[in-house]
Amino acid sequence: PNIEMEKISRPMSDWDYVYWGAPVSENIYSQIPGFLDKRYRWQSGTATGSWQNLGTTLPGQGFITRIADVAPFNVTPTAINFTMKGTANNGYVYVNVDSYDSSSIIYGNAILLSNPYPCAIDAATFLDHPNNTELGGTFSFWTSFTPISTSNPGPDTYNYNEADYATWNRTGGTGTKASTDTTGNDSLRPTGKIASGQGFFVHAFADGQIEFDNSMRLVSNVNTQFFRTSQNALANLEPEKHRFWLNFKDNSIAFRQMLVG
């Protein structure tokens, strides 16, 4: 069926990046809002990998966009509204992947994928699929929590903070900011329920095809974790496990979270 799916981000500022994916089969490049001035895809397969200009969106492949230095984003943090229109993806979705080697946790083995469906998918079911055995077990989600800064390490004058990748594996998720309530719902911590339109990194240790199918799709109300500042409680439901989180923070914005399980 034809759909119109609106994705609403948490409040964001100029220069922030958002990781997306198309829930429809058509190329939605022309639908990207004009204030998102930089648009890239990730090219794996070399030792370092590289960002390439985006020209076409494909189901299951992630892409990123940057917010331009324009109002209202350069005045006050504002949510992004991105409406994606087209034929909803359904059934099998295959993504060709190119790895650098069979074992290294390096940029060249990282692949940028996305949930190809207009509903959430379960990360564990995705990993368990017999055609996805070449994948590593950790997913990385960009939160864009730390402002771009000259104090962040990197090759440019102003750089982003790599610690802004929240992660999830079978033990659980680690966030990028300290929770301000007792539930932890606003800690930007992934739950393993990947929302529609969400792009993410995972490592691949062999060339081939990654497969998505309908067995991974979730039909209950868990399609909410697109890294807003306030999460729906249902999106944070996880199986009971024996584990605990250690938060390390200082009086500035610096924060690290460690999961032990």
Tell me what each language-model feature is.
Residues P1-D101, R243-G261:
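Self-processing/autoproteolytic domain segments and adjacent N-terminal interaction modules in large
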